[in-house]
């Protein structure tokens, strides 16, 4: 598992934001700071400004393609991914609307209002989108506003675009994905299977089903379509090009963001982290993952960063005993993040 998502591949490592996102197929991205570093850690020559510039060029977009969760995905694949996997979230949306006192007619009206407000290449902040809805007489009590923003994106009308300052923005999906790919359903299932096991393998069918939210039957079909593009060894499935590949050289310590595919992409995380440490990584089981320090493929600590004007301060909480030399290696693993944000690094150890 060491360096699983960062290892060299016979086909070469992606060297662009578009390449990394296409390689994974989708990267969880509800927390933008984590999403930026998930890209940056895999693009060592990039700064945060470089990644943001690539997102402004629409090398990737954010929307809710599966599990009702925000992901970075290739723009050209957004429509078919929403049709294939987002449909399950849509199926449950009526029940959600009942709990927040929002009827279907109002939801559809909200989609129309947002579509009109964003027409002509427009881009609006979250607050401006909500103001447009309110101005059209659409109710926004409680969670209704968030649901309408989600619903419009889930239906393939809008997408999340890069922040303006600290504010989330939205635009029409067709403006940011003007040349959509249109595979048929079986082909799409095969694409999802190939991309998942290429980037996450070795993994299992259950892992793919959990990651995508697809049915077991769809996962089975996807694997059949992928055919010899994937290798199977017992319950494990992976890219056959990796089976004779030597372990990743030179990467022993890593500093990964909280919502990273290294932690999120699997049903069983036993090879990555001790069960006794999960509470520290996901406090209270609330789904909010902490950033992790990884040694030899296993999580050995968590970290939190504070961006200042003169330095980035990182507080590290070890989960196992680390010798002084190992702490130095952990600190060295944090240096790429400091370079990414363009600030000197200051490390503080819990209990020190």
Label the predicted regions:
Residues 73-78, 164-182, 236-248:
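Short, cationic-aromatic polyanion-contact patches
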Residues 218, 225-278:
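Non-catalytic regulatory appendages
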Residues 1-141, 275-276, 313:
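Phosphate-backbone binding and catalysis cores of DNA-processing enzymes
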Residues 113-145, 194-235:
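Internal, well-folded beta-alpha domain core
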Residues 142-220:
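Loop-centered beta-sheet repeat module
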Residues 56-65, 69-70, 154-163, 227-234:
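A short, conserved structural fragment
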Residues 275, 281-352:
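Glycine-rich, small/acidic residue-mixed loop/short-helix segments
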Residues 83-95, 174-195, 199, 252-257, ...:
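Short, amphipathic alpha-helical interaction segments positioned at domain boundaries
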């Amino acid at each position: 598992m060491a360096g699983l998502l960062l290892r060299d591949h016979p086909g070469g490592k992606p060297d662009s934001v578009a390449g990394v996102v296409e390689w994974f197929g989708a990267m969880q991205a509800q927390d933008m700071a984590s999403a930026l570093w998930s890209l940056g850690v895999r693009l060592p020559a990039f700064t945060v400004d470089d990644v943001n510039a690539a997102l402004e060029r629409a090398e990737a977009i954010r929307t809710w393609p599966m599990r009702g969760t925000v992901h970075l995905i290739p723009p050209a694949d957004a429509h078919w991914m929403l049709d294939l996997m987002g449909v399950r979230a849509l199926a449950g949306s009526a029940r959600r609307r009942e709990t927040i006192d929002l009827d279907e007619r109002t939801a559809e009206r909200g989609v129309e209002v947002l579509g009109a407000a964003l027409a002509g290449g427009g881009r609006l902040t979250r607050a401006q989108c909500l103001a447009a809805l309110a101005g059209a007489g659409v109710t926004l009590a409680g969670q209704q506003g968030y649901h309408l923003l989600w619903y419009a994106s889930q239906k393939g009308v809008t997408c999340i675009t890069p922040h303006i300052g600290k504010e989330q923005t939205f635009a029409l999906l067709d403006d940011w994905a003007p040349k959509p790919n249109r595979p048929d359903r079986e082909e799409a299932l095969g694409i999802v299977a190939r991309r998942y096991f290429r980037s996450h393998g070795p993994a299992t069918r259950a892992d793919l089903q959990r990651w995508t939210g697809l049915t077991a039957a769809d996962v089975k079909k996807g694997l059949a379509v992928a055919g010899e593009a994937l290798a199977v060894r017992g319950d494990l499935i992976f890219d056959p090009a990796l089976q004779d590949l030597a372990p990743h050289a030179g990467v022993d310590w890593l500093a990964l963001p909280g919502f990273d595919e290294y932690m999120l992409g699997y049903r069983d995380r036993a090879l990555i982290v001790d069960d006794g440490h999960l509470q520290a990584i996901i406090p209270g089981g609330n789904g909010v993952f902490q950033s992790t320090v990884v040694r030899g493929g296993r999580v050995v600590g968590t970290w939190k960063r504070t961006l200042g004007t003169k330095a980035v301060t990182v507080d590290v909480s070890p989960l196992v005993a680390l010798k002084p030399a190992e702490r130095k290696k952990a600190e060295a693993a944090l240096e790429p993040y400091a370079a990414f944000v363009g600030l000197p690094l200051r490390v503080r150890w819990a209990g020190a």
